[in-house]
From Swiss-Prot:
Taxonomic path: Eukaryota, Metazoa, Chordata, Craniata, Vertebrata
Protein name: Homeobox protein Hox-D10
Gene from which this protein is expressed: HOXD10
Family named by the database record: Belongs to the Abd-B homeobox family.
Biased segments, Polar residues type: 208-217
Keyword Mitochondrion: no
Record GO biological process: regulation of transcription by RNA polymerase II
Length: 340
């Protein structure tokens, strides 16, 4: 059954159905036309406040004289959302422009509702952020404070901790820990006092320990020197090779005061024998340049040398005597010659 658009029955049916659909908070109707209530309508629900009536057209109708659509502002004043009687009404400023939030460089996190008691009284109204449109006044006093642990309050203790210039003293670190953790303040104080007492107790003990150690080490060193000397003497008596090494070390320690230790060029001679051994061998060489086997064995036993060492020493001494005699002869000959 089709009704023409000019008939009032069709319009009333269309309007009533759309009003019932819109009051049931459904913005999309099943019919072919869409209706939104006028701004003057009293509606308890919050919704889009556009108004207008768009009737449906038949297939063959192009224009109609009664057809029209009244367009109203899409978002009216926010005051019409709620009744003035309600307690949750939000007062709006005159201008609808959202104020720009101007944050200072030092952003204080403590200006929120969860504020400490010591800073609440000092708060100035200018420091409250410009969200007065949403929050008309600061937090009421009835709200309980949120307990914030001590490690969240670093801003109060950072300045004091920074002035210590990163000292390595345990007292400074204990004070910083006291400021950072106010709950355990009594425990670090006791620990700091204990540290001071331990320092005082450790200082004299540490001062006495090095002296004791030095006293213990010095007798050991003093006692070790004669022991080493006696061991060296025993080894020298037992083996002539070790004795030769010992003689080299003694010669290296002694200054070259005598001529028999130094050569003509000033360098130190290679002398594997001790002074006592060389003196005994020199005496025997003055008596006899050539030794028999029996005499060589006797000298080797008296000087603690082997038979072969005594034999080599006499051979070297004879070669040295020949060289010295040759040099003396040449020197005498050159001194007598005169060059014209």
């Amino acid at each position: 059954m089709s009704f023409p658009n000019s008939s009032p029955a069709a319009n009333t049916f269309l309007v009533d159905s759309l009003i019932s659909a819109c009051r049931s908070d459904s913005f999309y109707s099943s019919s072919a036309s869409m209706y939104m209530p006028p701004p003057s309508a009293d509606m308890g629900t919050y919704g889009m406040q556009t108004c207008g009536l768009l009737p449906s057209l038949a297939k063959r109708e192009v224009n109609h004289q009664n057809m029209g659509m009244n367009v109203h502002p899409y978002i009216p004043q926010v005051d019409s959302w709620t009744d003035p009687n309600r307690s949750c009404r939000i007062e709006q400023p005159v201008t609808q422009q959202v104020p720009t939030c101007s944050f200072t460089t030092n952003i204080k996190e403590e200006s929120n509702c969860c504020m400490y008691s010591d800073k609440r009284n000092k708060l100035i109204s200018a420091e409250v952020p410009s969200y007065q449109r949403l929050v008309p006044e600061s937090c009421p006093v009835e709200n309980p404070e949120v307990p914030v642990p001590g490690y969240f309050r670093l801003s109060q203790t950072y300045a004091t901790g920074k002035t210590q210039e990163y000292n390595n003293s345990p007292e400074g670190s204990s004070t910083v820990m006291l400021q950072l953790n106010p709950r355990g303040a009594a425990k670090p104080q006791l620990s700091a006092a204990q540290l001071q007492m331990e320092k005082k107790m450790n200082e004299p003990v540490s001062g006495q320990e090095p002296t004791k150690v030095s006293q213990v080490e010095s007798p050991e060193a003093k006692g070790g020197l004669p022991e080493e000397r006696s061991c060296l003497a025993e080894v020298s008596v037992s083996s002539p090779e070790v004795q030769e090494k010992e003689s080299k070390e003694e010669i290296x320690x002694d200054t070259p005061t005598s001529n028999w230790l130094t050569a003509k060029s000033g360098r130190k001679k290679r002398c594997p024998y001790t002074k006592h051994q060389t003196l005994e061998l020199e005496k025997e060489f003055l008596f006899n340049m050539y030794l028999t086997r029996e005499r060589r064995l006797e000298i080797s036993k008296s000087v603690n040398l082997t038979d072969r060492q005594v034999k080599i020493w006499f051979q070297n001494r004879r070669m040295k005597l020949k060289k010295m005699s040759r040099e003396n002869r040449i020197r005498e000959l050159t001194a007598n010659l005169t060059f014209s």
